[in-house]
Amino acid sequence: MPTIQQLIRSERYNTKKKTKSPALKSCPQRRGVCTRVYTTTPKKPNSALRKVARVRLTSGFEVTAYIPGIGHNLQEHSVVMIRGGRVKDLPGVRYHIIRGTLDTAGVKDRRQGRSKYGAKRPKD
């Protein structure tokens, strides 16, 4: 505990909160162009080929974003929308690509949790 004299000498200062998704610049989503679409392997206990894309954003940042769902139609120069949200077992991946917007197609034959994958309601 500081004394009153110490508080008079120099006031308390609030610690700045560090944002978890700086490339969004306080926006909920950002548009960008894919510069590279590839697969990568996750951290130690897990094993898979995770689909990711390198995206150049309108804010000027170039970030790595995860492509959720089974199958995708993304390639270089595809225009995508990204949101925040990291992938725990992929170091450096702090953004998700939003399915069903701009050039990204929704997940085909998706029946549950459709809104998260941009899938329309099935006809049956």
From Swiss-Prot:
Protein keywords: Methylation, Ribonucleoprotein, Ribosomal protein, RNA-binding, rRNA-binding, tRNA-binding
Region (Disordered): 103-124
3-methylthioaspartic acid, modified sites: D89
PROSITE patterns: RIBOSOMAL_S12
Compositionally biased spans, kind Basic residues: 113-124
Top-level taxonomic group: Bacteria
Range of residues in the leader sequence: none
Listed GO biological process terms: translation
GO molecular function, one term: tRNA binding
Keyword DNA-binding in record: no
Disulfide bridge map: none
Entry-linked InterPro entries: NA-bd_OB-fold, Ribosomal_uS12, Ribosomal_uS12_bac
GO CC annotation: small ribosomal subunit
Functional note: With S4 and S5 plays an important role in translational accuracy. Interacts with and stabilizes bases of the 16S rRNA that are involved in tRNA selection in the A site and with the mRNA backbone. Located at the interface of the 30S and 50S subunits, it traverses the body of the 30S subunit contacting proteins on the other side and probably holding the rRNA structure together. The combined cluster of proteins S8, S12 and S17 appears to hold together the shoulder and platform of the 30S subunit.
NCBIfam families: rpsL_bact
Subunit relationships: Part of the 30S ribosomal subunit. Contacts proteins S8 and S17. May interact with IF1 in the 30S initiation complex.
Family: Belongs to the universal ribosomal protein uS12 family.
Protein name, entry field: Small ribosomal subunit protein uS12
Species of origin: Acaryochloris marina (strain MBIC 11017)
Designated gene of the protein: rpsL
